[in-house]
């Protein structure tokens, strides 16, 4: 509820991440169309139940496995599938400095993969405390996926955010 109240965009990543591969890892493309749809709908419902508001229709498939028929199967239930181009690998727990270093490698328009569940996330939290002030000092602003997708390309977003910062 706090995250929703703060304006974070909350979308599903599937309902049962660990079970999405049916023994084949986290690959929804190996599931039946019915199971793929069920995973998305149950995830969206869990978010709605927890936050009191509708989940975003943006979806990120576990492991980034999103290809083939899954696009067609989920089309009525999602507006877009989002991937990432900077993986902090925080799920490996390599230490806060290593996570922060990966986070600091971003460029305007990048989508960063980080995790907030699955056990001890103290390294991720510490890395954010290190990296976010530096990124803000460099002029970065943080936007939701919907805000990012509203732009034709990341360059346009970077230019607009830079002009907004100059005006402040």
Describe the residue ranges of each PLM region.
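C-terminal domain-boundary segment and adjacent tail
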Residues: 122-168
């Amino acid at each position: 509820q706090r995250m929703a109240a703060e304006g974070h965009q909350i979308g599903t990543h599937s309902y049962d991440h660990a079970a999405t591969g049916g023994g084949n890892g986290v690959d929804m493309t190996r599931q039946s169309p019915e199971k793929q749809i069920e995973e998305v709908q149950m995830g969206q419902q869990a978010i709605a139940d927890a936050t009191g508001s509708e989940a975003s229709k943006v979806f990120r498939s576990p492991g980034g496995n999103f290809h083939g028929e899954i696009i067609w199967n989920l089309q009525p239930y999602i507006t877009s599938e989002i991937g990432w181009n900077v993986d902090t690998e925080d799920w490996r727990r390599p230490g806060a400095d290593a996570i922060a270093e990966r986070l600091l490698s971003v460029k305007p328009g990048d989508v960063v993969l980080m995790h907030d569940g699955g056990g001890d996330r103290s390294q991720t939290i510490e890395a954010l405390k290190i990296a976010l002030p530096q990124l803000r000092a460099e002029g970065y602003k943080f936007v939701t996926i919907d805000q990012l997708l509203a732009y034709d390309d990341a360059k346009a977003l970077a230019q607009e955010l830079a002009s907004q910062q100059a005006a402040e």
